[in-house]
Amino acid sequence: MDRLTAETKIKELAKRIERHNRLYHEEDRPEISDQEYDQLMRELRELETSFPDLQSPDSPSLRVGGEPLPFFEKVVHKTPMLSLGNAFNEEDIRDFDRRVRQAVGSQAVRYVAELKIDGLAVSLHYENGLFVRGATRGDGTTGEDITQNLKTIRSIPLRLTKPLTLEVRGEAYMSKGAFEKLNKEREERGEALFANPRNSAAGSLRQLDPKIAASRQLDTFIYGIGDLQGETVESHSEGLDLLETLGFMVNQERRVFDDVDELLAFIAGWTEKRPHLPYEIDGMVIKVDSYAQQEELGFTAKSPRWAIAYKFPAEEAVTILEGIEVSVGRTGNVTPTALLKPVSLAGTTVKRASLHNEDIIREKGLLIGDHVVVKKAGDIIPEIIAVLPERRTGNEVPFAMPTHCPECGSELVRLEEEVALRCINPMCPALIREGMIHFVSRTAMNIDGLGEKVVAQLYRDGIIHSVADLYYLHQQRDALLGLERMGEKSVDNLLAAIEASKENSLERVLFGLGIRLVGAKAARVLAEHFGNIDTIMQASEEEITQIDEIGPKMAASLVNYFAQPQAQAVIERLRAAGVNMEYKGIRIESGADLPFSGKTIVLTGTLTQMSRQEAEEAIARLGGKVTGSVSKKTDLVIAGEKAGSKLEKAEKLGVAVMDEAGFLQVLESNA
């Protein structure tokens, strides 16, 4: 390709990628899949590698991460990034209001209330509209230059919509979903787990290798202007509106108040609603809106007098650690779980808490009988965040992890660079049983009627020995009828569900096999790339690692799995039973008269008749696109049980809402 053609192609690709970034992050209506987006990015990087002088300073390719840095440079903040004073109750807020009104005299006062995102405070600098530097808050006066890591966050614009020179402040964070996904992947790899989303965001941005930050799903909300040239704004709310027009992500859950009682009611509402947010917040920030009044109020030595941070009551409780049990998962990981004296926390009774691995028990210094502090954030599994050694009586006893598998008796091992103990006996009953439970789960083969208890009973009674045996259960009808709560109709339904699962696309089979390190997304990438199971089985590590999303460890795991005669035998029995071994993808129906054609749809709450993945695929087949959050661009919200803030926002914006019954009726009418 000649230089002129390459220059044209690079500009075209950059424009397309930035458009899709905007559709995904700002408008919540993506038009292409992750795989299609990655392909565009690959094309751009290849061209820029061939013509490095054609790479622009705001190229989207800079988001994938450059070379590792030897250290972080120090950055002195032109305007200090001060911390805020705290308020812990209604009276603290009223005191703040009284102080403000007393200081400004007879002037009218308006406040802006915003969610306090639990992440890492960052400063972003732009010159003539281009992102040139980003830094951590540090001690408020001096931070660290993390520009290369921040460039990997897609919601941070590399070029603004106006050529302004300014500095903005915001919060980099990791959503609850991204945090749970990251920890699950780390657990499967035997790596140490992050304690919470905030720590994971901070840890990701302080990596010297930007590729690590790029691999983690970080996001930002910008909440203020530190310095601005060439534009005039007179209030904080006006400044937030400007930031949105420039291309920044600004949190939509903000309100302006001139009445403190209404402000307090708003705060109280979010105290109840915050568990339903997709990201963590630890309070609300209240700021005087007028910049003139902010200047008049000034600062103390530590914080501004015109702002305060309200901290939500901690969702924590003290209870007693009564014991620790260990279980063996499908990958062989031996996981300890804390058994707690039942305690009420965040509206539920907590009896168990995750401990993840032996290192966490040792780091926390846990003893059986200890008084411990338990925390629960949203839907995240409860965790022990602290031990209270001052309450020990002398009767507490240490816990020792087993040296042998509690299920099969094999010696446990700790593989290199892993923190988890692991059973590596492929014939371990726990590995086989848990592997089969995973295979039939909704995210894998999705076989209705085959829950954990049924699979465990089938395995315990010797009716099945591997996942392939599931597809021969029609030959053991009498044995099925002998199971607990299994009548003629239940058996018929179960066998029909097993038969239907044979038509699943390859990625579900691949994920269901439980190959170490291969999650649902990687399974889809592999299935889409290779097309069928035979091509994957014949692929070398080198061929597999050519795929951008697949690393050397996963490639080695795949090759090792398919080299095992036992795995080959299972796959051949599945094939012989008629299980599909080819990638089908999602079939999108054609035709403008489809019920969801061109519609942007948000799912919220729990659907009782299908999984979220099934619902998303059904919507896609009928022409719709599913996004994660509600905005003015949303056409329809489908609300299941316990729908939270998304439903409220839809009603506030006047977005159409459909319940599960209505959704099912649409699907049945278009079956």
Swiss-Prot record:
Keyword NAD annotated: yes
Cofactors (names): Mg(2+); Mn(2+)
Catalytic activity annotation: NAD(+) + (deoxyribonucleotide)n-3'-hydroxyl + 5'-phospho-(deoxyribonucleotide)m = (deoxyribonucleotide)n+m + AMP + beta-nicotinamide D-nucleotide
Record flagged with keyword Zinc: yes
Entry EC no(s): 6.5.1.2
Residues given in the record as Zn(2+) binding sites: C405, C408, C423, C428
GO CC annotations on file: cytosol
GO function terms (MF aspect): DNA binding; DNA ligase (NAD+) activity; metal ion binding
Keyword terms, alphabetized: DNA damage, DNA repair, DNA replication, Ligase, Magnesium, Manganese, Metal-binding, NAD, Zinc
GO biological process, one term: DNA replication
Main EC class the enzyme belongs to: ligase
Gene3D superfamilies: 5' to 3' exonuclease, C-terminal subdomain (1.10.150.20), 6.20.10.30, BRCT domain (3.40.50.10190), DNA ligase/mRNA capping enzyme (3.30.470.30), Helix hairpin bin (1.10.287.610), Nucleic acid-binding proteins (2.40.50.140)
UniProt-annotated catalytic positions: K116 (n6-amp-lysine intermediate)
Binding site for NAD(+): D34, Q35, E36, Y37, D38, S83, L84, E114, R137, E171, K287, K311
Family annotation (Pfam families): BRCT (PF00533), DNA_ligase_aden (PF01653), DNA_ligase_OB (PF03120), DNA_ligase_ZBD (PF03119), HHH_2 (PF12826), HHH_5 (PF14520), Nlig-Ia (PF22745)
InterPro entries the UniProt entry points to: BRCT_dom, BRCT_dom_sf, DisA/LigA_HHH, DNA_ligase, DNA_ligase_AS, DNA_ligase_CS, DNAligase_adenylation, DNAligase_N
Stretches assigned to the BRCT domain: 591-671
UniProt xrefs under PANTHER family: CHROMOSOME TRANSMISSION FIDELITY FACTOR 18, DNA LIGASE
Family: Belongs to the NAD-dependent DNA ligase family. LigA subfamily.
Functional summary from the UniProt entry: DNA ligase that catalyzes the formation of phosphodiester linkages between 5'-phosphoryl and 3'-hydroxyl groups in double-stranded DNA using NAD as a coenzyme and as the energy source for the reaction. It is essential for DNA replication and repair of damaged DNA.
Stated name of the protein: DNA ligase
